[in-house]
């Protein structure tokens, strides 16, 4: 994992990606009890060009030049399947911009704050997201104030009410 994180940092230094933050299962396990995950999800903003069409092509070109295998949506970097996900909405963009600088395996990297992960899980609402969201409410040291502000900002108040009614009876 250390070598993988170092390569991702190099992508930013080289200007291939503008900003990034670890999200998905690996980010979740930074804050809550570990479970299983297959890959490393890296949310990215790319350096803007004249086109408004978002493309991960520079990442795939880098992978090819660097001798890394591309397998479906993953680039296998130093043995770790990495899925680069574009910043496709305001929530993800803000989560990347507000990410915390942390040290993992001796490498400085960016990871999404727990409140943003929680809002993203509430928004996507897959079964594994709901399960992890319950763990976040009970295991992570998140800011209730920030979480509630983000829920309101990203129009998820009703969804949170439904979630709480279903899983907590209120």
Describe the predicted segments one by one.
Residues 1-170:
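Compositionally biased terminal segments of proteins
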């Amino acid at each position: 994992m250390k070598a993988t994180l170092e390569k991702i940092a190099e992508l930013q230094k080289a200007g291939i990606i503008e900003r990034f933050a670890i999200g998905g299962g690996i980010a979740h396990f930074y804050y809550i009890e570990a479970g299983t995950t297959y890959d490393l999800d890296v949310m990215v903003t790319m350096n803007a060009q004249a086109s408004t069409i978002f493309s991960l092509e520079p990442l795939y070109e880098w992978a090819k030049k660097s001798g890394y295998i591309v397998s479906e949506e993953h680039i296998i970097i130093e043995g770790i399947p990495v899925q680069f996900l574009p910043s496709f909405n305001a929530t993800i963009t803000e989560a990347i911009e507000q990410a915390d600088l942390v040290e993992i395996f001796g490498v400085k990297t960016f990871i999404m704050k727990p409140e943003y992960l929680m809002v993203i899980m509430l928004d996507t609402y897959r079964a594994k997201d709901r399960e992890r969201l319950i763990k976040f409410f009970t295991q992570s040291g998140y800011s209730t104030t920030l979480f509630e502000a983000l829920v309101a900002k990203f129009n998820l108040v009703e969804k949170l009410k439904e979630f709480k009614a279903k899983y907590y009876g209120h």
